[in-house]
A protein has these predicted regions:
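Iron-sulfur (Fe-S) cluster-binding segments and ferredoxin-like electron-carrier domains
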Residues: 25-26, 64-79
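Histidine-centered active-site/metal-ligand motif
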Residues: 55, 66, 98
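Immediate flanking context of iron-sulfur cluster ligation sites
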Residues: 39-57, 78-84
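Amphipathic alpha-helical segments within well-ordered protein domains
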Residues: 32-33, 50, 67-71, 85
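Short cysteine clusters
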Residues: 59-62
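C-terminal structural segments of small proteins and small subunits
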Residues: 81-106
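Acidic, glycine/proline-rich low-complexity segments that act as flexible tails and inter-domain linkers
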Residues: 1-45, 97-115
């Protein structure tokens, strides 16, 4: 078979990352724990947000990891899929909204052509 596009996130790779920057790695781990700790938002909501953002940032490791964590936090398949659809709309909506910039730019220039 062919090589995967994204290599596996193995224990050895994680250990090497910690070895190369232990203080930063420890700080990031603590940041992660604090962000995903119960607070104003429950775990399920935080993980659904993470699933949606992972799709927008297109991180395959995050998609897999946060989908599992969302499910463990009580999110059902339909809720997870709905979060993904919200992310898809927001990404598409961003392109749609930014067309305003292109239209303003075009309106401010003299054009010799159309299209």
């Amino acid at each position: 078979m062919s090589d995967p596009v994204y290599p596996a996130a193995t224990h050895d790779i994680g250990a090497r990352r910690r070895e190369l920057a232990p203080d930063i790695h420890q700080a990031f781990d603590e940041f992660n724990r604090q962000v995903f700790a119960d607070g104003a938002l429950p775990q399920k909501t935080k993980q659904l947000i993470a699933v949606a953002v992972a799709h927008v940032t297109q991180c395959p490791y995050c998609i897999a990891g946060h989908t599992k964590l969302a499910h463990r936090a009580g999110a059902g398949d339909a809720e997870i899929m709905e979060a993904i659809w919200v992310a898809a709309e927001m990404r598409a909506g961003g392109a749609f909204a930014h067309s305003t910039i292109a239209l303003h730019t075009l309106a401010g220039h003299d054009h010799d052509h159309t299209g």
